[in-house]
Amino acid sequence: MRHTKHKALQEVLTLDPRKDYERIVYLLACYEFPFDVARSGEMALFRTFAVPGIANLLHHTGEFTHRTQKRYDDTDLILSTIFENGFDTKAGRTAFSRMNKMHGHYIIPNHEMLYVLSTFIYVPIRWMERFGWRPLTEQEKLGLFYYMREAGRRMNIKELPNDYHEFEQFSLDYERDNFAYSGAAHKIADLNIDMFLGWFLPKFLRPLGRPFIYALLDEPMLKSFGFPRPPKIIVDLVTVALKLRAKLVSFLPERKKPLLRSKGSKRSYPLGHKLDEVGTKLS
């Protein structure tokens, strides 16, 4: 199979996640799991909407309700730029500056920032445990933890856990204590699902596609968004399709060139973008 003589994986196994986390995440996002990193990142962001405080702020800004596609593209561009270029490059520093400026325009509790950060560690890891073409190594799991911890420090997030399992437990406890239905969450989640389906389906067919998106959401998310539980057959179909994809990918030749999402075309920027202009326009 593909991973038995895989150069990127062999390199990962030589790296120290405490200091080589940027290289580990670059290999994950651009070589090993570009599809899975993108999809699980979407699910991580989606998961944060289940916290009423986060959903209410996003609804208040109007970014996810009036400019859903642009807000998605902006998030994708900023995160992809950091993944692909590194923290201390000009592009990486500009991306952090844009992100911090946008966040700094609002009063966001530290515990919400901590939780959002945690989702970008543990949601991708759980996704790849289920749907990845190979298991993640311990170096990759810890590398993602240390990477996001350093990202959190650069975002001025306080009380960052030092331990992988401690942060995971914080994330699980936070969801248990804070996930709840809110009208804002329902609205934002609904618009995002419509956006996802709009990439593939004409408007009149989108209601038929909704159960397939619901199939990717767990029970706490469905309840928080006020969405119905999808039929088991659809959940099974989605699961089988993603696992079949993973099996097929495992037999493909290894990627020779990195897949750079920040260089791809974006619906909101058909003529291209300037990184220092990406994001919300703040007064």
Regions found by a protein language model. Name each.
Residues 1-283:
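Mature, function-bearing regions of proteins
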